Amino acid sequence: MTKQIITLVGRPNVGKSTLFNRLSIRKKAIVHDLPGVTRDRKYTDGKIGSFEFLLIDTPGLDEHPNSMGERLIEQTTKAILEADLICFMVDGRSGILPDDKLLSSFVRKYNKPAILVVNKCEKAFDFDKEYYKLGFDSMIAISAEHGTGLIDLYDEIIAKLPEEESIKTNIADPIKGDCLQIVVSGRPNAGKSTFINALINDERLLTGPEAGITRESIEIDWQYKNNHIKLIDTAGLRKKSTITKSLEKLSASDTINSIKFANTVILMIDALAPLKQQDLNIASHVVNEGRSIVIVVNKWDLVKESEKEAFQEEFYYQINTHLPQVKGIPVLFISAINKQNIEQVLDACLKIYKIWNKKITTSKLNEWLNFTTEAHLLPLQKGGRRVRVKYMTQTKTRPPTFKLFSNNPEKITDSYTRYLVNNMREAFDMPGVPIRFIYVKTKNPYV
């Protein structure tokens, strides 16, 4: 039996994301006092008491001046249809507003079990008749921020969804295990959410022409060719100098944190926007974090056929020039909106993930090391003795990391290290992943 689903619904800024984080087994949502922070429905494993469930956070619904309002309603409707129980949230400080009344009617028409959750009740709270007029038979007052009232909420949830029907499973660790975590990153409006929607064949994420629609990292569990994949859509990363609002700073921090714990990062680039320093900065950050990377140029269908060859030539030149430390990064040209070449992206991710996890035997490493250092000798030290790398071994994967033992590691130049790394990349077929060398001084300086 699968876990039962609880969906949080309400107008903006009533505290849905705060309660989402409070009930989640790990923090997921950005919390900010600006209305409308959440724009997609988000899923997490939740727990209250001994009762485990799947929890959905939804966008705050209000009157939007453009087409985004319809898209937000669509996201919320899908979450309501999935739900076994709805927690309809209102703000106990501001009281019942016209939007609350409209939304309660919208929710009740689906005839789902529901609880009215009055949030931000740090002090004793009395329900007046306005709350009863919303039409819910179960009401509870809580403070999601301070954690008060959660025992009462637990009792109400159990009354609606008996505890014995839940499955008390252990939640998989988000980083370890066989789940491949793929983070989709890039500048705003590159088509990251459109790409994920095309992959999973569902309008799971809010998309549109407005830059910056995605404001926080959204995780989606998915299966591809018998591989368990977690797709993570992130907020677009702007230059630091252009990030002025505190919400954007939170979104950028959330994106950077997602990259830190990714297995593979897809760097999405808009074919209609020239490759900029910010794209290269993001790629460098991914590499510095030791993640594997796949570069995807989206909106390829909008580039004129006569210009594509020159575009690719210049693009590869820029990548190879500015990211020489990771030669062979996979680059794919796609159209997310037309679903052109999108599966090739996942195939590239699976391939580079295997390289990122590659383990090389010590015997093969040292056979390669002897041949490579003899072909290009290290410099002489004072006194005529040559700098040598005597021995090496692989200490870890993800990324491949090697320890090299030398009689004088301080004399090994960066250019010689690049020579070794590039030679290793070719010899062991390791394109596009960071390779790290750690030099250790041997106890005997004469070896």
UniProtKB/Swiss-Prot annotation:
Chain sites annotated for binding GTP 2: 186-193, 233-237, 298-301
Superkingdom classification of source: Bacteria
Keywords, alphabetical: GTP-binding, Nucleotide-binding, Repeat, Ribosome biogenesis
GO biological process, one term: ribosome biogenesis
Sequence ranges assigned to domain EngA-type G in this UniProt record: 4-165, 180-357
Residues annotated as binding GTP 1: 10-17, 57-61, 119-122
UniProt function note: GTPase that plays an essential role in the late steps of ribosome biogenesis.
PANTHER family documented for this protein: GTPASE DER
Family: Belongs to the TRAFAC class TrmE-Era-EngA-EngB-Septin-like GTPase superfamily. EngA (Der) GTPase family.
Protein name stated in the entry: GTPase Der
